[in-house]
């Protein structure tokens, strides 16, 4: 069995879709094949615990939304689907796609320090990544505030995974919200 620290959260089950047991998933992955290619996936309950293996039969993206619709083996009613809402969809960390030089996995940003200048102390730490039209970094400042920072190149021009920090060049007022 894969150890708990060796799992990647690739999505969260957020609702039932229709009456036939399909599930809506909010993705936490930039790789759509994690939701469309049949095969083994794992679910972990709202309170943690040991992941349970499930079989993805098929999946598709919901048109016009960032959500995916999944059909899991053995889940064939709305009630069965609703019982899974809130669980995390997992894959083994060993399933991470190989990246090119200079590329990184978005989930690797969590825990990085955020700096306004390379040679200055951090203003906070990235605590979460929120997927949407544009990904948002959730930043906890050293003053205890929580900020949402658009993860776009003009605002986050540099990411230094090996050094544990990223550079922010926010427009005026963004950090004051």
From Swiss-Prot:
This is Ribosome maturation factor RimM. It is found in: Cytoplasm. Belongs to the RimM family. Keywords: Chaperone, Cytoplasm, Ribosome biogenesis, rRNA processing. Binds ribosomal protein uS19. Transmembrane segments: none annotated. It comes from Parasynechococcus marenigrum (strain WH8102). One of its GO terms (molecular function) is ribosome binding. The gene is rimM. One of its GO terms (biological process) is rRNA processing. InterPro entries: PRC_barrel-like_sf, PRC_RimM, RimM, RimM_N, RimM_N_sf, Transl_B-barrel_sf. Residues 101-174 form the PRC barrel domain. An accessory protein needed during the final step in the assembly of 30S ribosomal subunit, possibly for assembly of the head region. Essential for efficient processing of 16S rRNA. May be needed both before and after RbfA during the maturation of 16S rRNA. It has affinity for free ribosomal 30S subunits but not for 70S ribosomes. The keyword Hydrolase does not apply. The keyword Chaperone applies. GO terms for cellular component: cytoplasm; ribosome. Pfam families: PRC_RimM (PF24986), RimM (PF01782). SUPFAM superfamilies: PRC-barrel domain (SSF50346), Translation proteins (SSF50447). It comes from the Bacteria. HAMAP family: Ribosome_mat_RimM. Signal peptide: none annotated. The PRC barrel domain binds ribosomal protein uS19. Coiled coil: none annotated.
């Amino acid at each position: 069995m894969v150890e708990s620290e060796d799992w990647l959260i690739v999505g969260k089950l957020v609702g039932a879709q229709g009456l036939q047991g399909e599930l809506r998933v909010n993705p936490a992955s930039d790789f759509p094949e994690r939701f469309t290619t049949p095969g083994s996936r794992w679910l972990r309950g709202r309170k943690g615990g040991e992941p349970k293996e499930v079989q993805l039969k098929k999946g598709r993206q919901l048109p016009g939304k960032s959500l995916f619709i999944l059909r899991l083996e053995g889940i064939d009613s709305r009630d069965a689907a609703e019982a899974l809402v809130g669980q995390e969809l997992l894959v083994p960390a060993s399933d991470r796609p190989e990246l090119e030089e200079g590329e990184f996995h978005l989930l690797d940003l969590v825990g990085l320090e955020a700096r306004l200048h390379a040679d200055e102390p951090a203003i906070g730490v990235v605590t979460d990544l929120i997927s949407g039209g544009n990904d948002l970094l959730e930043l906890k400042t050293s003053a205890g505030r929580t900020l949402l920072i658009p993860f776009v190149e003009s605002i986050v021009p540099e990411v230094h995974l090996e050094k544990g920090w990223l550079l922010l060049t926010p427009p005026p007022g963004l950090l004051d919200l």
